[in-house]
Amino acid sequence: MENFFALIIGVGGDLAATAEDATAIKNLLCDPNKGGYLPENIAFLVNDDSTKKNVIDSLENIISKTKKLDKATVLVYYSGHGLQIPNDADPEKTEYFLKTSGADKLKKEETMLNGALFSEKIKQIKADKLLILLDCCHADGMKYKNISELEGMMIEEKPSNRGLLEKLDSGEGRVFISACDDNEESVILPGSKNSLFTEVCLEVFDGKLSPNDEFVSVVDLMYYVIKEVPKRVLPFHHIQRPIISEVHHLSPDYFVCRNGNYKPVQKDLEDFLINNSAERIDFIKNYNNKI
């Protein structure tokens, strides 16, 4: 797992649950008995550490490391808030931002991460497998959480999940997943510690779907996220449909992390195992909320 890298961001502040989500992801991935990532290969930025500068520095560090490798897997997880903001010079044009620690309404370029810059850095990552998870537009306990640092902005703020994903270059080995669409919210269900999107991701990373597989595949992740998130919010009369990128040549051998609950099957029973990869890939292909 020495060629597996991760950048995990939880903005925190008024969105305290985002730091908890990021911490849960980090703890599972770097656990040697679970995700198996080397601690030195994980950049972990939460609360005051999740500044724009630290995010950019961490991305550039990953860019530098992956340039030297033939094959690498990179996971970028962001839990916070995305914004769609009219351009200062031309209000007809829209800019996309990810909130970072210290966001200042008067200095958005200096204190928030512009989607174009984020996309540029992501493009520079030379990894044959790249997974971007965006858990934006949080609602705590089924209620929307305000961001006090951004209150009073004399601009129209809109969620930016779809716009941000559209800026990212898709392609073979590149998978982008956002927790919800622009007119929706990423919720924390009553009694849950983490957002529903992150909770479902954690279940997959922990091997819930494929206990007989040594590694967790991105096919399992995409399948479970787009299947479970919309289903689990229905009893609360809520709609939440994750957005995924269109992925060509999606391979069941695209692994995200080690399966901490791996239970090897006896040799004499291996021929009786059911491989669900083809069925899950078809389910993903037929999902209609894509970029």
Predicted features along the sequence, with ranges:
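Cysteine endopeptidase catalytic domains of the caspase/legumain-like
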Residues: 1-290
